[in-house]
Amino acid sequence: MMGFVKKIRDFFDLDEEKWEEDEYEQEEVAQQPKVEQKQNVVSLQSVQKSSKLVLFEPRAYAEVQEIADHLKNRRAVVVNVHRVDRDQARRIVDFLSGTVYAIGGDIQQVGSTIFLCTPDNVDVSGSISIVSDDEPTIKRW
């Protein structure tokens, strides 16, 4: 029987003396620096502090550029044009309409002579009825 086992060992090359154990060296793995990811968390207080609403009562068309500059700087503006004549008021509203269009904002009439101009970072919800039963009807813009 030993002959049979020896033949199998020789066939499969299972001779105990031929086996050498390989020596394994442990490789040092280079530590890669951790990539710090910036978190996409913004404090609500910082967002609220940076938002501003500016009120204007222009007395001349020349003031409209200052109003537009506030819109370009992403500030909402409420404009009351009651201090200028109707033609000047129309020019002011036309200029501001072009400005809010260019910056992707919005303009809404919230009173007979009051307009709310908002840049694209300000959302306005709700609506205000301009004409009520108590007020006399005024021609719309």
From Swiss-Prot:
GO terms for biological process: division septum assembly; FtsZ-dependent cytokinesis. One of its GO terms (cellular component) is cytoplasm. It comes from the Bacteria. It is found in: Cytoplasm. Its main location: cytoplasm. The keyword Cytoplasm applies. Transmembrane segments: none annotated. It holds the Pfam family SepF. Cell division protein that is part of the divisome complex and is recruited early to the Z-ring. Probably stimulates Z-ring formation, perhaps through the cross-linking of FtsZ protofilaments. Its function overlaps with FtsA. Homodimer. Interacts with FtsZ. PANTHER family: CELL DIVISION PROTEIN SEPF. This is Cell division protein SepF.
